[in-house]
Amino acid sequence: MIHDAFEDFAAALPQMTALVGLDFGEKTIGVAVSDRIGAVATPLETIRRKKFTLDSNRLLEIIAGRDINGILLGLPRNMDGSEGPRCQSTRAFARNLSRVTDLPIGFWDERLSTVAAERALLEADTSRKRRAEVIDHVAASYILQGALDRMRHIRSS
């Protein structure tokens, strides 16, 4: 089930659960996973997009192998908060994904996540080639970590 409101997504999840975070792009899908207590997001891999069936099969393999209980997609809003074509693509991907899994699917505002990931990689003195290889799944971990932090705040209130 797709949850547009993050609070609804958080409420649909078990208390202690692992999540997968996705940075959905035109050519790639950055993938990050959380630990089972939902405290730390870790970059996992970048999927080179091909066809939806192949992409979703790889995601479902990751989900099955890591006991994931929720899917979080970064929503690439414009800087003014409006939704453009990239948001529409992300929402369409979520709708298609909801047809192949019963896991709750939520969204997290991903504005500037790639910028933050790029900055962190530059500070770590990562080569340009290596940055290009890992930027998407590092951005996915930034997206997922932001959501995990918010979820912890919601649950402690």
Swiss-Prot record:
Q: Where in the cell is it found?
A: Cytoplasm
Name its GO BP terms in alphabetical order.
Answer: rRNA 5'-end processing
From the UniProt record, list the coiled-coil ranges: none
Q: Which InterPro entries match?
A: RNaseH-like_sf (IPR012337), YqgF (IPR005227), YqgF/RNaseH-like_dom (IPR006641), YqgF/RNaseH-like_dom_sf (IPR037027)
Q: What is its EC number?
A: 3.1.-.-
Q: Name one GO molecular function term.
A: nuclease activity
Which residues belong to the signal peptide in this entry?
none
TM annotation in the entry = none
The record, for PANTHER family, names: POLYNUCLEOTIDYL TRANSFERASE, RIBONUCLEASE H-LIKE SUPERFAMILY PROTEIN (PTHR33317:SF4)
Q: What is this protein called?
A: Putative pre-16S rRNA nuclease
Organism of this sequence: Ruegeria sp. (strain TM1040) (Silicibacter sp.)
